[in-house]
Amino acid sequence: MADVRTHAHQVQVHPLRQHEGGIKVVYPQSGPSSTQVLAVVAGVPVGGTLLTLAGLTLAVSVIGLILAFPLFLIFSPVIVPAAFVIGLAMTGFMASGAIGLTGLSSMSWVLNHIRRVRERIPDELDEAKQRLADMAEYAGQRTKDAGQTIEDKAHDVRESKTYDVRDRDTKGHTASGGDRDTKTTREVRVATT
C-alpha cells in the first residue's frame, strides 16, 4: 500500500503593522507648521504680482507687434536685408568668439603640457646624471682593474727576467766567479724598479 507520511508544516506568524506612508508622511496629522503658513502667506502675493506683470508684458508685446506690423510691411525691403546683415554679423561675432575660445583653450593645454614636461625633465635629467655617474664609476673601476692587471703582469715579467738573469749569471758564475752574479741581479732589480 501507499506509504503515508506526515510532513511537518512550518507556519510563519507576522504581526500586523499599520502602513505609515503615502499622504500622511507629506501632510502630518498635526497640521502645517508656522513656517509653512508664513511661506504661503508671503508667496501668494508675490506670485500673483509676478503673474500679473507677465500677463501685462505679453499684452503690451502683442499690441506693439500689431501696431508695428504695417511699418514692417512698408519698410520690409530695407528691414529684411538689414536683418540678414545683422544676422550674419552676429554669426561672425559668435564664430570669432568660438574660435578665440578654442585658441585660448588650446594655448592653455599647450602651456600645461609644457609645464608638465618641464617638471618631468629634471627627474629624467637626474636619472641620466645618475646613470652617467654609475657608468663613469664602472669605467673607472674597470680601468683600475685593467691597470692592476697590467701592473701584475709587468711585475711577473720583471720577476721572470730577474730569474732568467740569475739563471744566466749562475751559469756564468760557475764559469767566472760568484761576485759577478750578485751584481747583475742587483742591477736588474734596480733597473726594473
Swiss-Prot record:
One GO term of the biological process aspect: post-embryonic development
Positions of transmembrane segments: 37-57, 66-86, 87-107
Which keywords has UniProt assigned to this entry? Acetylation, Lipid droplet, Membrane, Transmembrane, Transmembrane helix
GO CC, one annotated term = monolayer-surrounded lipid storage body
Q: Pfam families from the entry?
A: Oleosin (PF01277)
Q: How does it sit in the membrane?
A: Multi-pass membrane protein
Modified positions (N-acetylalanine) are A2
Q: Where is this region: Polar?
A: 2-39
Query: Which residues lie within the region annotated Hydrophobic?
Result: 40-113
Q: Does the keyword Membrane apply?
A: yes
Q: Which InterPro entries match?
A: Oleosin (IPR000136)
Domain of life of the native organism: Eukaryota
Here the segments flagged for biased composition (Basic and acidic residues) are 142-193
Q: Per the record, which residues fall in region Disordered? A: 139-193
Location of the protein in the cell: Lipid droplet; Membrane
Q: Which family does it belong to?
A: Belongs to the oleosin family.
Function description: May have a structural role to stabilize the lipid body during desiccation of the seed by preventing coalescence of the oil. Probably interacts with both lipid and phospholipid moieties of lipid bodies. May also provide recognition signals for specific lipase anchorage in lipolysis during seedling growth.
Protein's name according to its UniProt entry: Oleosin S1-2
User: To which species is this protein native?
Assistant: Brassica napus
- Supply the source organism's classification: Eukaryota, Viridiplantae, Streptophyta, Embryophyta, Tracheophyta
**GN (gene name):** S1
